[in-house]
Amino acid sequence: MTKFYRAVFASLALAAVLAASSVNAREFVMGHTGQPQMTFSGVGTQFAEKLKELSKGDMTLSVMGASALGNNREGLEQIQQGMTDFWIISTGLLAQFSNAVSVFDLPYLFKSEEAFIAFMSSPLAMEIVAPLEQKGIKALGYFPYGWRHIHSNVAVRKPEDVKGIKIRTEPAPIRMAIFKSMGANAIPMDFGEVFTSLQQGVIDAGENTIESIESQGFYTVNKYVTLDGHILDPMLIVISKITWDSLNDAEKAIVQEAAAYACEWGQKNTFGNCKAMIKKFKDAGKPEIIELTPEERSKFREATKAVYDEYVNSVGKDVYDKIMKFQESFAEAAPQS
């Protein structure tokens, strides 16, 4: 755990201990869309276990994964209405509520996994998502979803290889613009429709994390995965503002500490899990894994420069500049997961 998180949550934990007698018996519900083998499914489990431990059994959490409570759009509506207490979600799906959150969609933003982990544990990272509270969604902490890569029936080694292909993206303007800038036909589509659409030829390709490519079986209908890492996707544990406001100080402290613990677990496990899946793909010989050289990856960054020109001011040039300054001491490292 970083020094920042240690300092903050040590004080919160102390507050919880001092006010332990005021912790009430509470039953919460968390939803997410992850499959059991995905790291963020484990994050939900870790959060539930730590919440129960810290509250000495008074606060319990039922985790409903694999879209049992609905898709992410439905989940966010439930969070805003206070029908569901917690959700685990990618920042890319929160851009509709805050322009600043869209900064994480800018292509090739983070220099390395190390830089990403350090930034996610910084005060600035929490400042970026603070405006979500005005929309009824409170962010509790970050962990990585992983690098997003191109999976396709075309061997993609340079931006020109993407030209003309029909690629599914999340319905977020910047994510669509990334592939439009390379000449692809970017098609926004609900995640649950991707496999069938690939199978039926409605789309030629998608862009997802290795965990999603593996867990959803996309590799069975696409021949290639190109490790371009155009986005390093942050995930958030969020709580309904309605639920948050119903908690007393001791309960809030326990929720924050449990979330910090679960997010740190996610930070430690996501990239390793993705690397293990890549090794499994390589050993099986399917799909073919295409690893880009630094020179090849730089061509993708150059090809998407227009996305920055179009969107950096709308997401907040000051926020972007702060992220880049934060990374100055970190070396560039190509994604291996």
Where are these regions (language model features)?
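Hydrophobic helical h-region of N-terminal Sec-dependent signal peptides
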Residues: 9-18
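N-terminal secretory/targeting leader peptides
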Residues: 10, 25-115, 123-337
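Bacterial N-terminal signal peptides that target proteins for export
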Residues: 1-10
